[in-house]
Structure formats: structure tokens, C-alpha cells
Amino acid sequence: MSGPRIGILALQGDVREHARALTEAGARPVAVRHAVELAEVDGLVLPGGESTTIGRLLRVFELLEPLRAAVAAGLPVFGSCAGMILLARDVVGGRPDQPLIGGLDIVVRRNAFGRQVDSFEAHLEVVGVAGPPVHAVFIRAPWVEKAGDAVEVLARVAEAPVTVRQGPLLATAFHPELTGDARVHRLFVDSVRSSGSGR
């Protein structure tokens, strides 16, 4: 059986690194730059980058409303760092005109751990990820300030939620694609398969 076809929003961020991790996790990665391509994938990854820039690019490429519709229709989506911000219902510390896709009942704080100079690495126990702790790379990372009752917190740093899941949506404040460890991607790919989206 071939793996699920997972799109990677290819407007900014670590597209190649996500593709490598998805392949290792048993998926078939494909770049997504146009709304018509959303109908051809079983799930989608929103990479990191600069969330306000990505939001503007979503409007330029006419992807914002199609992405909102896809999330509302149940498309499994995994957002890392800026991807977590885009999936949030609200953002603290962001621009008032920040375009959001939404879907996760969370409020996130941009650059919660500080600016670029305050980037750090940590080892996290992530619910649903077997084996040793996950090596997590945080770069100008957000954290979750508030989470609704339907949101499952999978990992924390200093009591702040940094990995959350709600239905078919998964988000991390860190960059799992940068470490060579595909277990977080496998968690997402497995959820795509179990949702019935995987072919």
C-alpha cells in the first residue's frame, strides 16, 4: 500500500526538510502552491517561516479562503512554528491584520520565548511519540496561551503548551523537520491514515 499524499505549503520555510521527514514517515510529499492542488492531497503541512509574511503570501496566491475551507471540511493539517500561529484562532503579539487559517481553538503568543537570539533546543516528552524524548528546536517560537476544552496538549516547555492536537489538526511550536527525527511527522502521517484520508 502506498502512503498518503501529504502536501507541503511551499511558499516559505523548510519545505525540503519536511519532505524528507514525511518520506521517512511513509508518506508521499508534494509541494502545494495553488488552491487546486489542495484537492489532490490527503493532508497538509504548514512549515515555519515568518507568519505575517506567509499570511500575506496566502492572500497573494489566493490560498487563504481555500485553506480555511479545507480545514473546515476536515483536511488533516500539521503546522510547525509559524504553521501553529496560522492554525490558531487568535494571536497575542501579532499584527492586527495577521491573516489566520484557524481551526485550532487556541490563542498563541508570537515570539513567546524571545527573538532570534533567544532560540534554543530542548528534549520533550510528546504524547503519542514512543521512544526517547524528542529533540526540539525552537526558533522565535510561539507558545499556546489559551487552549479550548477540545484541544489536547501533547507537550510543554516550562508549563507552556508547545505541541497540541485537535481532531485532525496537529501543531508544534518547534521545528521537528530540522533534527533528522521523523517521529512527529510519523504521528501526523499515522493520524492521516487513521482518519481515512490516506490512500
Curated annotation (Swiss-Prot):
Catalytic activity: aldehydo-D-ribose 5-phosphate + D-glyceraldehyde 3-phosphate + L-glutamine = pyridoxal 5'-phosphate + L-glutamate + phosphate + 3 H2O + H(+); L-glutamine + H2O = L-glutamate + NH4(+)
Keyword Lyase assigned: yes
Catalytic residues identified in the record: C81 (nucleophile), H175 (charge relay system), E177 (charge relay system)
Pathway entry: Cofactor biosynthesis; pyridoxal 5'-phosphate biosynthesis
InterPro entries: Class_I_gatase-like, PdxT/SNO, PdxT/SNO_CS
Protein origin, superkingdom: Bacteria
One cellular component term from this protein's GO annotations in UniProt: cytosol
Binding site for L-glutamine: G49, E50, S51, R110, I139, R140
EC annotation from Swiss-Prot or TrEMBL: 4.3.3.6, 3.5.1.2
Alphabetical GO biological process terms: glutamine catabolic process; pyridoxal phosphate biosynthetic process; pyridoxine metabolic process
Keyword annotations of the record: Glutamine amidotransferase, Hydrolase, Lyase, Pyridoxal phosphate
Keyword Lyase part of the UniProt annotation: yes
Any one GO molecular-function label of the UniProt entry: pyridoxal 5'-phosphate synthase (glutamine hydrolysing) activity
Function as written in the Swiss-Prot or TrEMBL entry: Catalyzes the hydrolysis of glutamine to glutamate and ammonia as part of the biosynthesis of pyridoxal 5'-phosphate. The resulting ammonia molecule is channeled to the active site of PdxS.
Assembly and binders: In the presence of PdxS, forms a dodecamer of heterodimers. Only shows activity in the heterodimer.
NCBIfam families with a match to the protein in the record: PLP_synth_Pdx2 (TIGR03800)
Similarity-based family: Belongs to the glutaminase PdxT/SNO family.
Stored HAMAP family: PdxT (MF_01615)
Name of the protein in its database record: Pyridoxal 5'-phosphate synthase subunit PdxT
Species this chain originates from: Frankia casuarinae (strain DSM 45818 / CECT 9043 / HFP020203 / CcI3)
Native organism taxonomy: Bacteria, Bacillati, Actinomycetota, Actinomycetes, Frankiales
GN (gene name): pdxT
